[in-house]
From Swiss-Prot:
Binding site for Mg(2+): D80, D122, K123, E447
Protein name, as recorded: Dihydroxy-acid dehydratase
Source organism per UniProt: Listeria monocytogenes serotype 4b (strain CLIP80459)
Gene3D superfamilies membership: IlvD/EDD C-terminal domain-like (3.50.30.80)
Gene: ilvD
Metal-binding as UniProt keyword: yes
Protein task: Functions in the biosynthesis of branched-chain amino acids. Catalyzes the dehydration of (2R,3R)-2,3-dihydroxy-3-methylpentanoate (2,3-dihydroxy-3-methylvalerate) into 2-oxo-3-methylpentanoate (2-oxo-3-methylvalerate) and of (2R)-2,3-dihydroxy-3-methylbutanoate (2,3-dihydroxyisovalerate) into 2-oxo-3-methylbutanoate (2-oxoisovalerate), the penultimate precursor to L-isoleucine and L-valine, respectively.
Length: 564
């Protein structure tokens, strides 16, 4: 066993003494059992994580029943909704790397035989995923699960995105204070990840088709007994993985990454999943995975399930309608959309996992014969503003908008843009350009949920577009193009756009262009000032120095002279 490194031999007597002191070694035979890490992310200020201590206790009990010795450790978490719109958001994406590094550190320092990961919210799941393929120790994931949708006094289903959009409506005078406060109080009624197909739930759904979590992981409610049952089931599967020495890199292959994007297309997941899945491919050693490949997948996968913020349906509605398994079963039956014979943590293939799945509500999950769209709900755009690509959640765009042409109004920060939207400087026909908010420029590639929500909340969702080298919350909808790469801070051409330039967003042709000649853009480049980092000390300064643009997944790049 891997853990023999710390518990076998005369030389490890001091280590054994310390292990006895933990209280986890309850009999002499325990030293002969697999040591299983529980990588938890319990934290009181994140509603998606307040119940994870309880879930870890369920996992510990099941691991002991299955013949392992559990050792729990914790990592950090950032709540993107609470960190939104201020300096806290600059720490959100960088927290992914902290989580990956922290988990790697504990797992490798203590030679665990297996790892049970318990994530839930936005950057925690991808951070743990990066750690799982980096350490490549047998592992399984079981998230904390989504919260229930809220309900307004008027009987309207609510999610967190409802509140963000209500801010714009209230500021604009189109919502009463009574309705505004009612929405604030009732949008998030339980613990769990936010109730729509936002980033957290998108990632937790993708875990099922990646093969790293059991069916039900993405949609089973946080407050349900079924969530505890999933934890127990996952613990027993993990012990089988340890026994058979099946590792994350055996499961997360190039085909698995393809299938993750296929499910993403079918369910209209968050654009943040693109960032995280590209980073996962890089960490897993999968070469030549680019945005064009994602577009190729989108062209062969139909859009089957439109969930909040793109509709009023919540994750619980998806669960009741058949869950992720029902969507995946449609893709299996479609033929050629995914690779269904890959192995998963259950010991079965994707095909076997979903063999008995069916759609229970065709309003929530459309059958493959009647999709929302014959192509996927995410799209990668290319053009002279985004030569390395950009991302848009086309499932969140009004279907009447296929091509948007408008006049650029440019801002060098999130806050400048929000102020201009609030004071009505931004008007119909504008393309709001927010740059220097990418991974390096932000730093941390903050989410632009406040400006997009204000635009939609004011009823301008079809009349104003927003493009940025920053990113969006999974709660974003409207004509919102993010992840523009290279970013402005890396000299990307988004930095060369001027007020009044005409920008065209062409969804059918997947292009994003400014109507300015290459010669003019090169002249403008000569006048472009050198980027200066906004943060000079601490973690964000180190992050700025190492991070790359969105087309890589926003990974940290080790200087070549250190690895040659």
């Amino acid at each position: 066993m891997r853990s023999d490194k710390i518990k076998k031999g005369v030389e490890q007597a001091p280590a054994r003494s310390l292990l006895h002191a933990t209280g986890q070694i309850k009999s002499p035979g325990d030293m002969d059992k697999p040591f299983i890490a529980i990588c938890n992310s319990y934290i009181d200020i994140v509603p998606g994580h307040v119940h994870l201590r309880e879930l870890a206790d369920v996992a510990k009990e099941a691991i002991r029943e299955a013949g392992g010795i559990p050792f729990e450790f914790n990592t950090i978490g950032v709540d993107d909704g609470i960190a939104m719109g201020h300096i806290g958001m600059r720490y959100s994406l960088p927290s992914r790397e902290v989580i990956a590094d922290a988990a790697e550190t504990v797992i490798n320092a203590h030679w665990f035989d297996g790892v049970f990961y318990i994530p839930n919210c936005d950057k925690i799941t991808p951070g743990m995923l990066l750690a799982s393929v980096r350490t490549n120790v047998p592992a399984i994931f079981c998230s904390g699960g989504p919260m229930k949708a809220g309900l307004s006094a008027h009987g309207k289903a609510l999610t967190l995105s409802s509140v963000f959009e209500a801010v714009g409506a209230f500021k604009d005078g189109s919502m009463s204070q009574e309705d505004f406060l009612d929405m604030e109080a009732n949008a998030c009624p339980t613990c769990g990840s936010c109730a729509g197909m936002f980033t957290a739930n998108s990632m937790n759904c993708l875990m099922e088709i990646l093969g790293m979590a059991v069916p039900g992981n993405g949609t089973t409610l946080a407050v349900s007994d079924a969530r505890r049952d999933l934890i127990r089931e996952s613990a027993f599967h993990l012990m089988d993985l340890v026994k058979k020495d099946i590792r994350p890199r055996d499961i997360i292959t190039k085909d698995a990454i393809d299938d993750a994007f296929a499910l993403d297309m079918a369910m209209g997941g968050s654009t943040n999943t693109v960032l995280h899945t590209l980073a996962l491919a890089n960490e897993a050693g999968i070469e030549d995975y680019d945005l064009e490949r994602i577009n190729d997948i989108a062209k062969r996968v139909p859009y089957l399930s439109k969930i909040a913020p793109s509709s009023s349906y919540s994750m619980h509605d998806v669960h009741e309608a058949g869950g992720v398994s029902a969507i995946v079963k449609e893709l299996v039956d479609l033929g050629g959309a995914i690779h269904p014979d890959r192995i998963t943590v259950t010991g079965k293939t994707i095909r076997e996992n979903v063999a008995d799945a069916k759609i229970n509500n065709t309003d929530v999950i459309h059958p493959k014969e009647n999709p929302y769209s014959p192509v996927g709900g995410l799209s990668m755009l290319f053009g002279n503003i985004a030569p390395k690509g950009a991302a848009i959640k086309v499932g969140g765009v009004d279907p009447s908008v296929q091509v948007f042409k408008g006049e650029a109004i440019c801002f060098s920060s999130h806050d400048e843009a929000v102020e201009a939207i609030d004071n009505h400087t931004v008007r119909e026909g504008h393309v709001v350009v927010i740059r220097y908010e990418g991974p390096k420029g932000g730093p941390g590639m903050p989410e632009m949920l406040a400006p997009t929500s204000s635009i939609v909340g004011r009823g301008l969702g079809k009349d104003v577009a927003l493009i940025t080298d920053g990113r969006f919350s999974g709660a974003t909808r409207g004509i919102a193009v993010g992840h523009i790469s290279p970013e402005a801070a890396a000299g990307g051409p988004i930095a060369l756009v001027h007020d009044g330039d005409i920008i065209t967003i062409d969804l059918p042709n997947r292009t994003l262009n400014v109507d300015v000649s290459d010669e003019v853009l090169e002249e403008r480049r000569k006048e472009l000032p050198k980027f200066k980092a906004k943060v000079k000390t601490g973690y964000l300064a180190r992050y700025t120095a190492l991070v790359t643009s969105a087309h890589t997944g926003g990974i940290l790049q080790i200087p070549e002279d250190l690895i040659d």
